[in-house]
């Protein structure tokens, strides 16, 4: 029973609905009805006017302000970037100039140190040469003294040996002065 009454109620609603649809089926959709064209055009013009005023007075200035702010920010950023680039270029130029000066100074110092070392080495070499020449001269003097002393001894020994040889070989006595003069002429 309960199901039958609900179904019956539902069936009546469907029939009423079909009757209402049939009434409206012959009518035209209101936006497409040319009878109301002037009213539609009026409200279109008023809506467009409100939208135009709203966009021109509220939205366009805001968008313009945002665009102007963005343009100003971009210009500011470009100016700042240009300024920073100029500062960086100045720093690089200063760095390169100071580096070149430091290299030149280092080269000058190295040359001066090299020249100083050359001069010191030359002075030391000359001093050593002078000392060596002095020692060599002293050594030559000592050698000459020793040679002269040895030659004096050799001369007397040679005289005695010569006298002894001559006496043994030919059994003749010779004068010492004769032997001495012969030995001197033979040595020099």
UniProtKB/Swiss-Prot annotation:
Task: Write out the annotated subcellular location.
Answer: Cell inner membrane
Q: Which cellular components does GO assign to this protein?
A: plasma membrane; proton-transporting ATP synthase complex
Residues that span the membrane, as ranges: 35-55
For membrane topology, the record states: Single-pass membrane protein
Q: Does the keyword Chloroplast apply?
A: no
Q: Single GO molecular-function term?
A: proton-transporting ATP synthase activity, rotational mechanism
Keyword Plastid: yes or no? no
Report the InterPro entries cross-referenced here.
ATP_synth_b/b'su_bac/chlpt (IPR002146), ATP_synthase_B_chain (IPR050059)
> Which Gene3D superfamilies did the record assign?
6.10.250.1580
Any Pfam family from its record, for instance, is ATP-synt_B
Q: Which UniProt keywords apply?
A: ATP synthesis, Cell inner membrane, Cell membrane, CF(0), Hydrogen ion transport, Ion transport, Membrane, Transmembrane, Transmembrane helix, Transport
Where's it mainly located?
Answer: membrane
Q: What is stated as this protein's family in its record?
A: Belongs to the ATPase B chain family.
Q: What does this protein do?
A: F(1)F(0) ATP synthase produces ATP from ADP in the presence of a proton or sodium gradient. F-type ATPases consist of two structural domains, F(1) containing the extramembraneous catalytic core and F(0) containing the membrane proton channel, linked together by a central stalk and a peripheral stalk. During catalysis, ATP synthesis in the catalytic domain of F(1) is coupled via a rotary mechanism of the central stalk subunits to proton translocation. Component of the F(0) channel, it forms part of the peripheral stalk, linking F(1) to F(0).
Q: What quaternary arrangement does the UniProt entry report?
A: F-type ATPases have 2 components, F(1) - the catalytic core - and F(0) - the membrane proton channel. F(1) has five subunits: alpha(3), beta(3), gamma(1), delta(1), epsilon(1). F(0) has three main subunits: a(1), b(2) and c(10-14). The alpha and beta chains form an alternating ring which encloses part of the gamma chain. F(1) is attached to F(0) by a central stalk formed by the gamma and epsilon chains, while a peripheral stalk is formed by the delta and b chains.
HAMAP family for the chain: ATP_synth_b_bprime
State what protein this is by name: ATP synthase subunit b 1
**Organism from which the protein derives:** Bartonella tribocorum (strain CIP 105476 / IBS 506)
């Amino acid at each position: 029973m309960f199901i039958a009454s609900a179904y019956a109620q539902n069936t009546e609603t469907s029939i009423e609905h079909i009757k209402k649809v049939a009434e409206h089926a012959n009518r035209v959709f209101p936006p497409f009805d040319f009878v109301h064209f002037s009213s539609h055009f009026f409200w279109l013009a008023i809506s467009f006017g409100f939208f135009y005023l709203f966009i021109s007075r509220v939205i366009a200035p805001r968008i313009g302000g945002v665009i102007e702010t963005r343009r100003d920010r971009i210009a500011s950023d470009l100016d700042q970037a240009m300024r920073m680039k100029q500062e960086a270029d100045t720093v690089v130029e200063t760095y390169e100039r100071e580096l070149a000066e430091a290299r030149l100074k280092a080269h000058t110092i190295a040359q001066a140190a090299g020249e100083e070392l050359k001069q010191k080495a030359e002075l030391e070499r000359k001093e050593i040469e002078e000392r060596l020449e002095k020692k060599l001269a002293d050594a030559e003097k000592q050698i000459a003294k020793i040679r002269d002393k040895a030659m004096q001894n050799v001369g007397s020994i040679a005289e005695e040996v010569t006298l002894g040889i001559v006496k043994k070989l030919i059994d003749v006595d010779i004068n010492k002065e004769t032997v001495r003069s012969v030995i001197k002429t033979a040595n020099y």
